[in-house]
Amino acid sequence: ELEEAISNLIQKLEKDEQILEVQTKQGIEFLPLKNILYIESCKHYLRIRHVDGECEMRGKISNLEKWMTNYGFIQTHRSYLVNMRFMKMVRTNEVELDNGELLSVSRDKVQDVREKQMIYLRSFAYADN
């Protein structure tokens, strides 16, 4: 049990330290994934909303989605990749974040988003024990 608890703690710490390198017009920003609320795709740009503000970079959300789902992010809509850490509530057609922002959820993704959020929340409840 002790080994398993230590292993879970190490995995949690490693996830907390993941960084997204964002090439902006001003230069390169290094954003810890744990500080990113969501990423919104708009045409050929990605708007990255984080705890200290937002930034923008060129790119496709599909390129980030494959990697970021391993670190607590879920695609709620073709335009949004959301950090489950900041999700307060999943409604029929939207997700409410802790800060009150509302983001779209596709009808075909609502059930999957709810299930994954429950799994995510349970993993933290067990990690805290």
Language-model features, listed with the residues they occupy:
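Hydrophobic helical membrane-anchoring modules
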Residues: 101-103, 111-112, 118-119
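Short, charged, intrinsically disordered terminal tails
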Residues: 117-129
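DNA major-groove recognition helices of helix-turn-helix
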Residues: 64, 112-113
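Conserved binding/recognition cores within well-folded domains
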Residues: 3-105
